[in-house]
Regions:
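Short, charged, intrinsically disordered terminal tails
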Residues: 1-5
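Acidic/glycine-rich phosphate/pyrophosphate-binding loops and surrounding catalytic core
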Residues: 84-135
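Compact, glycine-rich, soluble single-domain proteins
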Residues: 7-101
């Protein structure tokens, strides 16, 4: 018999953001978003910048995460992220500025521009703006 819930833990090096029993979650993995339900087959994936969402106490909770790893087990999902923010912690002005700086760097496309780093900055800023409804 499959469990009805699983434990979700989301942590950064600085803090534990979430530790809750939930019924489902969407997590940005290396190959796209992972839909996780109780009893999911075990897997380990790189975490991509994006939004983790899960229903909790009558509403959908959403967090922005950057790089890291996600471990999925049938009764527990652990997300270890370089950085993560709850919706109310996102600084919209800062995210908009970061997106503009990264886009400007990509437009330059000279030898001096670290394209991969600029693309990563675009993904992080886009995820932050998406979670607060600005994209």
């Amino acid at each position: 018999m499959l469990p009805e819930t699983f434990k979700l833990e989301i942590a950064t090096p600085e803090r534990l953001l979430v530790s809750a029993d939930i019924k489902e979650a969407q997590i940005p993995g290396e190959g796209g978003y992972l839909g996780i339900l109780p009893g999911h087959a075990p897997l380990l994936s790189a975490l991509q910048p994006g939004v983790i969402s899960f229903p909790r106490e009558g509403h959908t909770e959403r967090l922005v995460v950057t790089w890291g790893y996600v471990e999925v087990l049938p009764t527990k999902v652990t997300v270890l992220a370089e950085a993560a923010e709850k919706v109310e912690e996102v600084d919209v002005g800062r995210a908009e500025q970061a997106l503009q700086r990264a886009m400007d760097r990509l437009k330059q496309a000279t030898v001096d521009v670290d394209v991969a780093r600029a693309q990563a900055a675009v993904r992080r800023a886009t995820a932050r703006l998406h979670v607060v409804g600005k994209l």
